């Protein structure tokens, strides 16, 4: 029985789907820079969730948005002398190549924010009609946080009053303030050619409203799971809940899942701190993509993971050992019966995954299983059962063992 830790309730809850198809919305990449391996820790966790749900027989529809309009993207395009479209298409292409390199499954839909402006306008109008949004003196349209009594329940923070209104996508160093936030940003000359002429006026969408528009279009007003990194909890996901309540009267998602940070030398890996590695950085040093993936799965997504090259070397050795065990098995034709070993390993693996996708424990179980089968000479039937068990593990973890 699958249990997932719900950020909203701060409890592990039995997963109960809302309908026949499990709807999952992923906050995808902001495509103004290369994604680093800390970003990919979250995307790998999400990939494993989808794989495991399908393994358990669920039908899944996964939507991963592409954030191709935001303050930082506009600023970066201007600095690099590129159009916003050229910039975001380049980094989107790199991201998709990285996904393939890491053997991540494609989402069912990859919606772009720039392709959903009509939906964004419609939702904002609905919020204005319902009294949750207003036009500021600067011409921008803001969400009135005072109208939503549950604001702050996702983040569980002690929030305090900040500025009356915040127009920028990010709120600076202070991430525990209550402020009205921009849904539609009125045009400024710094925006250059990035604007839309709509019934809301000349301008562009705020960052938070994009996810409300894309999730509701592709998954409906209410779906099963909303996923992201812990940095998304506040203000982004808090604001998404507020927006959806303002437009539709309900929280969009039943379960909210968030992946913890990847650390490096005890500090959060981030673009702003400049202490990050991209997939290309590490493969350029000779490390194989699946070893990197193995390391990123080596601890539960609910715990911080500290990246070191020593741990990466160890992950390289572990995955190579698994491959050698599998290759040896393909040539084995002994007399030992491995049915009990297989059944025990599969049961333990599923228990670990059912416990909030504990991939760290699942990897250890797979390693122990490899050690056990290495000590016997299984017969032909047992060899097939062992290999099938490894295939099941691999179909869930996506490590390319076959």
Language model segments and positions:
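Alpha-helical recognition segments enriched in aromatics with Gly/Pro capping
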Residues: 1-32, 47, 118-328
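Short catalytic-loop micro-motif centered on adjacent basic/acidic residues
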Residues: 62-63, 108-111, 226-228
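Structural preference for alpha-helix termini/caps and helix-kink/transition segments
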Residues: 276-402
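N-terminal, positively charged, Ser/Thr/Ala/Gly-biased leader segments
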Residues: 97-131
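Short, polar/flexible loop-turn hinges at active-site or ligand-entry regions and domain interfaces
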Residues: 80-86, 107-109, 304-306
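N-terminal, positively charged nucleic-acid-binding surface of large information/translation enzymes
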Residues: 9-103
């Amino acid at each position: 029985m699958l249990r997932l830790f719900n950020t909203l309730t701060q409890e592990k809850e039995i997963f109960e789907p809302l309908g026949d198809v499990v709807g999952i919305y992923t906050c995808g990449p902001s495509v103004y820079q290369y994604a680093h391996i800390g970003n990919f820790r979250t995307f790998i966790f999400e990939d494993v969730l989808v794989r495991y749900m399908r393994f358990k027989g669920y039908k899944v529809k996964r939507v991963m948005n592409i954030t191709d309009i935001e303050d930082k993207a506009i600023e970066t395009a201007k600095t690099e002398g590129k159009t916003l479209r050229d910039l975001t298409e380049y980094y989107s292409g790199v991201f998709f190549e990285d996904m393939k390199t890491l053997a991540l499954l494609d989402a069912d839909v990859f919606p772009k924010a720039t392709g959903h402006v009509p939906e964004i306008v419609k939702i904002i109008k609905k919020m204005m009609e319902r009294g949750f949004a207003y036009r500021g003196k600067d011409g921008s349209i803001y969400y009135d946080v005072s109208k939503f009594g549950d604001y702050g329940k996702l983040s569980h923070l002690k929030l305090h009053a900040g500025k009356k209104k915040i127009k920028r996508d990010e709120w600076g160093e202070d991430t525990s303030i209550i402020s009205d936030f921009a849904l539609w940003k009125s045009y400024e000359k710094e925006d250059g050619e990035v604007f839309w002429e709509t019934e809301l006026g000349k301008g562009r969408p705020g960052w938070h409203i994009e996810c409300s528009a894309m999730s509701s279009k592709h998954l409906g007003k209410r779906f099963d799971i909303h996923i992201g990194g812990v940095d998304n909890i506040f203000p982004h996901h808090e604001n998404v809940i507020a927006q959806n309540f303002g437009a539709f009267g309900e929280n969009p998602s039943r379960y909210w899942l968030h992946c913890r940070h990847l650390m490096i030398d005890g500090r959060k890996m981030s673009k702003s701190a400049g202490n990050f590695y991209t997939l290309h950085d590490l493969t350029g040093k000779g490390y194989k993509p699946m070893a990197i993936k193995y390391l990123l799965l080596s601890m539960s997504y609910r715990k911080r993971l500290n990246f070191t090259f020593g741990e990466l070397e160890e992950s390289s050795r572990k995955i190579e050992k698994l491959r050698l065990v599998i290759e040896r098995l393909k040539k084995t034709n002994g007399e030992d019966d491995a049915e009990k070993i297989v059944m025990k390993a599969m049961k333990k693996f599923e228990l670990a995954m059912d416990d909030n996708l504990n991939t760290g424990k699942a990897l250890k179980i797979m390693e122990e299983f490899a050690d056990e089968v290495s000590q016997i000479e299984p017969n032909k039937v047992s060899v097939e059962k062992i290999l099938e068990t490894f295939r099941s593990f691999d179909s869930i973890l996506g490590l390319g063992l076959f």
